[in-house]
Amino acid sequence: MNELTRTFFNSSVHDTDPLIAQALDDERARQKNQIELIASENIVSQAVLDALGHEMTNKTLEGYPGNRFHGGGQFVDVVEQAAIDRAKQLFNCGYANVQPHSGTQANLAVFFLLVKPGDRILSLDLAAGGHLSHGMKGNLSGRWFEAHNYNVDPQNEVINYDEMERIAEEVKPKLLITGGSAYPRELDFARMAQIAKKVGAFFMVDMAHIAGLVAGGAHPSPFPHADIVTCTTTKTLRGPRGGLILTNNEEWYKKLQTAVFPGVQGSLHSNVLAAKAICLGEALRPEFRDYVAQVVKNAKVLAETLTSRGIRIVSGGTDTHIVLLDLSSKGLNGKQAEDALARANITSNKNPIPNDSPRPAEWVGMRLGVSAATTRGMKEDEFRKLGNVVADLLEAESAGNGPEAAEKAKVTVRELTEAFPVYAH
């Protein structure tokens, strides 16, 4: 082995790329020392990290187990088949495609399968908690299809199923979509399936945010009501970045294989498939049900604590991991609130709420999520404490005393992160 080869195979990132090494070290420290309250984030297990950094990342493959376009894929076949089998068992469905690189890629594959350019789709309005890949104009789905929206009731901010039915009868969509990125309430899949059937639409559920809750029995399953289901393996599933597509329709499944490859993707990410299989296996264990039950308890406590401090919670509470705040009564916008929490080492994100401004700079909403902090082991007492810290920070920001309050809050955050640490390294 010559020196160049020896260096290539044996040098760490700290040896070869100080800039990136420093960024990686800084990110590790950030995750260790900050409390993550972004609803779309979680913390993966060490086993998932092991898979993501494995040599399997070197293997290029196209096709499916037993039917590949490249040789040497026998061990990737093992992990992909395990991921398929575990997904089917976890979500009690007949067929699973585990190759999508993301939830949006999974959605695109379903569109490729079920609808044609110009067809009508009906989905939850983005400001009401929907997702950009469900027909937003800035997304390909909004350019390819004639997108229409249903909304939440202006009084209780919960999906108005009667109004959804009225719109569906008027629009006659080819595809009815539910799910999104900021809807905190339980979804009535049975009612929506009835609406879809009544108007002759396919019914698709994007459960990216609630997949872990469904898997652990903390939210009703979209099966047997949905025709097809997509999700991510991140968020409440605590896995790597990637997507899944699930169905009970054998004919669709066969067509779905080609919709994913070569329809919207090329080669698969072999190491990510291994990580997906691991996280799905973790979700099949009894302790995962305990985890998601705690997630919902923690979210409810956080919402109740913030409400008791005079902060309005959209829809009056939550049934999931998401708590959506209306900051207008505090005279703040979402970015100001996000910055106020960030100064105290709490990460969050601004978010639109129902009937919010279309301009992100003017959004008055903030989305909080409890999944990552629950993974660290925090329970109700910690979330009462966190809720009061968040309320203190928002009140101080509104009064012009944000930086001073942040210094005090940092002490509590440090106590919590030290009491509930992450990885040993």
From Swiss-Prot:
Residues that bear N6-(pyridoxal phosphate)lysine: 235
Subcellular location: Cytoplasm
Activity sensitivity to pH: Optimum pH is 7.4-8.0.
GO cellular component: cytosol
Keyword line: Cytoplasm, One-carbon metabolism, Pyridoxal phosphate, Transferase
Keyword Hydrolase: no
InterPro entries: PyrdxlP-dep_Trfase, PyrdxlP-dep_Trfase_major, PyrdxlP-dep_Trfase_small, Ser_HO-MeTrfase, Ser_HO-MeTrfase-like, SHMT-like_dom
Activity control, per UniProt: Inhibited by hydroxylamine and sodium borohydride.
UniProt-listed Enzyme Commission number(s): 2.1.2.7
Cofactor: pyridoxal 5'-phosphate
SUPFAM superfamilies: PLP-dependent transferases
Class of this enzyme: transferase
Reactions mediated catalytically: (6R)-5,10-methylene-5,6,7,8-tetrahydrofolate + D-alanine + H2O = 2-methylserine + (6S)-5,6,7,8-tetrahydrofolate
UniProt keyword Acetylation, yes or no: no
Site (Plays an important role in substrate specificity): 234
GO molecular function, one term: pyridoxal phosphate binding
Protein name, UniProt field: 2-methylserine hydroxymethyltransferase
Native source species: Paracoccus sp
